[in-house]
């Protein structure tokens, strides 16, 4: 974490976008042990301990950030062994890769979320209906939160492929009256198509997109249908790979909630939330398949694609926000319009 003091306001249930924290390690300069916020449900230390995430404090994270900025993303290690042998450790660090992490973070089974106009407590869709601190810390999810104003039969049916999806993707669809079925990442295209969705969403997720070979093969089958598709972040990259494009690893990626992206169709610039280390290579795009729709104002890298002759559009940034600016939330409205036969 680049800010020097972390944990001032603790961990709040309503802010959680997944059933548990997914980092393999957590590094801070100074950890606040007495959070001061009426919304706080536990400390960061409690949260990490329950989920087995190792952490370390007392690190000059700003100096570390400068190194990563200049040298690029690199492998690192947190250890409790003060007598480690550097000569033995370095080869292990050099060989380390994240691997097929999507399979670790996806949901275990298919589940459904009904379309609504509002959420009773604006809580996370994967959370418990009644807050219980022990259940929250352990990641236990027995119930969905209460939903109000159900739009029975009025909503479009959306298939959401969970590649590590943030809750607010499903929430953004449900708030527009869509009935959302969430599928594990390794679900076959045939199963999704058999459920006859009005639209398909490919979610965000972690890791190198080229590690997702089997998922890419299924996405290719989804591309060949006439079902409208909207993809975000990792989903955007996988759709590109499924249709013959390429991706590459960035020096240190885009991280944070203040990245300007330009809509090439209007010239308008939006501030976006981003968290990715890979990007689609625009030099290897086939214009007969897809054309750039958004670019990053800072470095000119690709931030979105529009697929030629298809009801498919994808973005690298996070229109669902949570956290971050909500400037591009209109893209969910665009997807809804597309499912209704518009463009």
Language-model features: where?
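Catalytic beta-strand/loop cores that center a nucleophilic Ser/Cys/Thr
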Residues: 268-309, 343
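Residues that mark the start of a beta-strand
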Residues: 155-159, 179, 228, 271, ...
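A glycine-centered loop/beta-turn motif at secondary-structure junctions
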Residues: 304-343
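Flexible loop residues that form catalytic
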Residues: 31, 205, 278, 310, ...
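RNA-binding accessory domains that recognize and position tRNA/RNA substrates
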Residues: 1-190, 194-195, 209, 322, ...
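Cysteine-nucleophile active-site neighborhood
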Residues: 199, 203-279, 324-340
């Amino acid at each position: 974490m680049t800010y020097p003091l972390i944990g001032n306001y603790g961990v709040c249930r309503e802010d959680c976008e997944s059933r548990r924290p997914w980092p393999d390690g957590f590094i801070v300069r100074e950890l606040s042990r007495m959070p001061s916020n009426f919304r706080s449900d536990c400390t960061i230390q409690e949260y990490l301990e329950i989920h087995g995430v190792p952490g370390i404090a007392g690190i000059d994270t700003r100096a570390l950030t400068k190194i990563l900025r200049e040298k690029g993303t690199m492998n690192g290690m947190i250890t409790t062994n003060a007598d480690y042998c550097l000569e033995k450790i370095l080869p292990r660090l050099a060989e380390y890769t994240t691997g097929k992490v999507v399979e670790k973070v996806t949901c275990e089974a298919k589940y459904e979320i009904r379309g609504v106009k509002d959420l009773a407590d604006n809580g996370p869709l994967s959370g418990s209906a009644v807050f219980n601190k022990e259940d929250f810390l352990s990641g236990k999810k027995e119930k969905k939160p209460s939903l109000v104003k159900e739009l029975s039969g009025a909503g479009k049916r959306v298939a959401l492929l969970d590649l590590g999806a943030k809750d607010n993707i499903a929430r953004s669809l449900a708030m527009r009256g869509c009935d959302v079925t969430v599928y594990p990442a390794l679900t076959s295209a045939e199963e999704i198509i058999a459920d006859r969705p009005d639209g398909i969403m490919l979610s965000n997720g972690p890791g190198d997109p080229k590690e997702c070979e089997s998922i890419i093969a299924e996405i290719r089958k989804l591309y060949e249908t006439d079902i409208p598709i909207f993809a975000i972040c990792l989903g955007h990259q996988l759709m590109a790979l499924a249709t013959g494009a390429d991706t590459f690893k960035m020096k240190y990626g885009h991280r944070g909630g203040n990245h300007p992206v330009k809509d090439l169709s209007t010239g308008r610039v939006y501030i976006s939330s981003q968290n990715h280390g890979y990007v689609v290579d625009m030099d290897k795009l086939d214009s007969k398949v897809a054309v750039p729709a958004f670019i990053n104002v800072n470095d000119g890298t690709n931030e979105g694609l529009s697929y030629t002759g298809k009801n498919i559009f994808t973005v690298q940034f996070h229109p669902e926000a949570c956290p971050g600016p909500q400037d591009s939330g209109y893209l969910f409205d665009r997807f809804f319009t597309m499912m209704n036969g518009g463009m």
